[in-house]
């Protein structure tokens, strides 16, 4: 269940803080946002991307010099929504540190690799999966041809970025993303998608 669905059911824990002015309650995600922690949980779509982008921009305006932590547990989803997050991660001034909890697949893995170099992490039992973008089309033959060309261009764009982020040769990225390619946390580090596997907070 995604964070937003959980919130809709009223199951998000509340945190109560004491201050000189009395008590204040926050939902847990708002409290963690104060600590500069953003979550991507569940599928990547336009709604989720809009929330993540807004949080990145807010945290940049709050403190442009302090790192942002981005926790990812996602099966992937829309390429255009994912690219909106990717571009904003690079656009904002603070470094964005990424951490895989559970699974980062498809666009989730792409965003995991998009973290600041040296600040991309995974918990030890997490899984990561990369593959080529998929899409379906219908309509006239010419429309299907246009869509197919666009998917091929997108695949080329994503592969080039992955090669740059991992240090792997483009030919290997192209070969590995031809089908679903699963990695353990340690294999993910060896591949260059992350920089470190962590089991305890330093």
Swiss-Prot record:
Catalytic activity: Hydrolysis of proteins to small peptides in the presence of ATP and magnesium. alpha-casein is the usual test substrate. In the absence of ATP, only oligopeptides shorter than five residues are hydrolyzed (such as succinyl-Leu-Tyr-|-NHMec, and Leu-Tyr-Leu-|-Tyr-Trp, in which cleavage of the -Tyr-|-Leu- and -Tyr-|-Trp bonds also occurs)
Domain of life: Bacteria
Keywords: Cytoplasm, Hydrolase, Protease, Serine protease
Family annotation (PROSITE patterns): CLP_PROTEASE_HIS
Subcellular location, record wording: Cytoplasm
Active-site residues, as the UniProt record annotates them: 106, 131
Pfam families: CLP_protease
EC number: 3.4.21.92
One MF annotation (Gene Ontology) recorded for this entry: ATP-dependent peptidase activity
InterPro entries: ClpP, ClpP/crotonase-like_dom_sf, ClpP/TepA, ClpP_His_AS
GO cellular component: cytoplasm; endopeptidase Clp complex
Known partners and oligomeric status: Fourteen ClpP subunits assemble into 2 heptameric rings which stack back to back to give a disk-like structure with a central cavity, resembling the structure of eukaryotic proteasomes.
Cross-referenced HAMAP family: ClpP
Database matches in PANTHER family: ATP-DEPENDENT CLP PROTEASE PROTEOLYTIC SUBUNIT
Protein name: ATP-dependent Clp protease proteolytic subunit
């Amino acid at each position: 269940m995604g964070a937003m669905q959980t919130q809709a059911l009223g199951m998000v824990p509340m945190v109560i803080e004491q201050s000189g002015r009395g008590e204040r309650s926050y939902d847990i995600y708002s409290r963690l946002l104060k600590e500069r922690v953003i979550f991507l949980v569940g599928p990547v779509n336009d709604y989720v991307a809009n929330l993540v982008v807004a949080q990145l921009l807010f945290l940049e305006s709050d403190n442009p010099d302090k790192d942002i932590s981005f926790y990812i547990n996602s099966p992937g989803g829309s390429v255009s929504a994912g690219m909106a997050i990717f571009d904003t991660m690079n656009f904002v001034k603070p470094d964005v540190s990424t951490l895989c909890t559970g699974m980062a697949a498809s666009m989730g893995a792409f965003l995991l690799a998009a973290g600041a170099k040296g600040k991309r992490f995974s918990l030890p039992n997490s899984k990561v999966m990369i593959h080529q973008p998929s899409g379906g089309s219908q309509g006239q033959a010419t429309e299907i041809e246009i869509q197919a060309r666009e998917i091929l261009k997108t695949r080329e764009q994503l592969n080039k970025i992955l090669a740059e982020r991992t240090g792997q040769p483009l030919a290997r990225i192209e070969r590995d993303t031809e089908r679903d390619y699963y990695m353990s946390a340690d294999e993910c580090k060896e591949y260059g998608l992350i920089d470190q596997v962590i089991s305890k907070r330093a």
